[in-house]
Amino acid sequence: MELLCIDSKEKVKISEKIFGQKFNESLVHQVVRSYRITKRQGTSAQKSRSEVIGSGKKPWRQKGTGRARAGSVKSPIWRSGGVTFAKKTRDFKHKINKKMYKNALKSIFSELCRQNRILIVKNFFVKSEKTKLLKKKLNEMNLENVLIISKTIDKNLVLSSRNLNKVHVCFPININPINLISFKKTIITIDAIKIIEEILT
């Protein structure tokens, strides 16, 4: 397979095993769902009546006071009492093996390639850390919502992109399915393509 490099106007060979696979929707859905679930904190917790601090003594006698009967100050119907079905901390980790994860990334890259959402460049940098310079460069390329994958990330590029919520810069080793499907276009440097091919083969 070959793609045209935007800045040098030369054709770049890319692996068909990574950028020319059939789109496996069910696998991508499974991996994306697993990735999102794993990111959940699961730290929400409440106290049940057995965990609330308080006396175990009956507040008043059963009969003769005129008030409703009560057996504990820790009852869920009392103020400051325990919660009936108290939430507990949970581990939301959902395991996906490496082969499935790699195949999902290959499938996503292939679909992006088919939809002409991948742009190849020799290098991508800005002269200063000013956001307006990066925005101007992207406007010249007719880009707004973009993921930039580069082998060597320029400090100016990182600093200038931080203020743009629709622009994300990352190393090839840090790519994940959420990033790949979240942006309309993906800019990849030639050096980064080689690393991606090494990682996914």
Curated annotation (Swiss-Prot):
Please name the Pfam families in this protein's record.
Ribosomal_L4
Q: Which domain of life is it from?
A: Bacteria
Q: Where is this region: Disordered?
A: 39-72
Identify the InterPro entries for this entry: Ribosomal_uL4, Ribosomal_uL4-like, Ribosomal_uL4_dom_sf
Establish whether keyword Ribosomal protein is in the entry. yes
Please cite one Gene Ontology biological process associated with this protein: translation
Q: Name one GO cellular component term.
A: ribosome
Family listed:
Belongs to the universal ribosomal protein uL4 family.
Q: Which PANTHER family match?
A: 50S RIBOSOMAL PROTEIN L4, LARGE RIBOSOMAL SUBUNIT PROTEIN UL4M
The molecule here is called Large ribosomal subunit protein uL4
Query: What organism does the record attribute this protein to?
Result: Wigglesworthia glossinidia brevipalpis
Q: Which gene encodes it?
A: rplD
